[in-house]
Amino acid sequence: MKRSKAYRAAAEKVNLDQLYSPEEALALVASGASAKFDETVDVAIRLGVDPKKADQMVRGTVNLPHGTGKTTRVLVFATGEKAEAAREAGADEVGDDDLIAKVQGGYLDFDSVVATPDMMGKVGRLGRVLGPRGLMPNPKTGTVTMDVAKAVSDIKGGKIEFRTDRYANLHFLIGKVSFGSEKLAENYFAALDEILRLKPNAAKGRYLRKITVSSTMGPGVQIDPVAARDAD
């Protein structure tokens, strides 16, 4: 795969054999970005868990102190006063049966979904559409709730979700290159602390196996898992 000149220039600053501290890695990512748009900064973490076992699934949410820098479109399934509260909180789409039909018809212009508990029986029909995209509302992530206004405000304000995939990897964003390395680091540590808090009791050996940060168009920079926090 042929890389761009800007990518190669950024990659030259990174020692692929070196494990960096979080601050060093994020400084390299921020300084190496050269695209004409404000690149997103992503984190990939390989965990020492067995995702095939239910008691080792790592899933959670965290409110990033500096937000994500991304405009998040939130869809809410609710009726009556709850629907009105969601609209006032800034939800992009609010509805019940009509909105379910719209999504079934192929509408997917949203990034997050919230629902009141009484709507989940109907929202369950959308499992084949929302499930594979990681968009199905879930009580564990605060997206099945009676307080839809708070859920919408949290998501709009920088709340992110993460969950292990079948290879025990987590993928999530921590902001934009324009944030600068200091704010990116604060967002990174907020997410990492929550991931460490959620370490399954059944997990064996080292929990944080590999951590890589990168910008949208830049090379991956590896963070030393031991230096990431008290990793073991």
From Swiss-Prot:
Provide the protein name. Large ribosomal subunit protein uL1
Look up keyword Electron transport and say if it applies: no
Organism, scientific name: Cutibacterium acnes (strain DSM 16379 / KPA171202)
Gene Ontology cellular-component terms for this entry are: large ribosomal subunit
Kindly give the CDD domains that the UniProt entry links to this protein: Ribosomal_L1 (cd00403)
Q: Which InterPro entries does the entry link to?
A: Ribosom_uL1_bac-type (IPR005878), Ribosomal_uL1 (IPR002143), Ribosomal_uL1-like (IPR023674), Ribosomal_uL1/biogenesis (IPR028364), Ribosomal_uL1_3-a/b-sand (IPR016095), Ribosomal_uL1_CS (IPR023673)
Q: Which gene encodes it?
A: rplA
| GO BP term (any one) | translation
> What's the stated role of this polypeptide?
Binds directly to 23S rRNA. The L1 stalk is quite mobile in the ribosome, and is involved in E site tRNA release. Protein L1 is also a translational repressor protein, it controls the translation of the L11 operon by binding to its mRNA.
Subunit structure and binding partners: Part of the 50S ribosomal subunit.
Signal peptide span? none
Does the keyword rRNA-binding feature in the UniProt annotation? yes
Task: Give the similarity note.
Answer: Belongs to the universal ribosomal protein uL1 family.
Q: Which UniProt keywords apply?
A: Repressor, Ribonucleoprotein, Ribosomal protein, RNA-binding, rRNA-binding, Translation regulation, tRNA-binding
Q: Which GO terms describe its molecular function?
A: rRNA binding; structural constituent of ribosome; tRNA binding
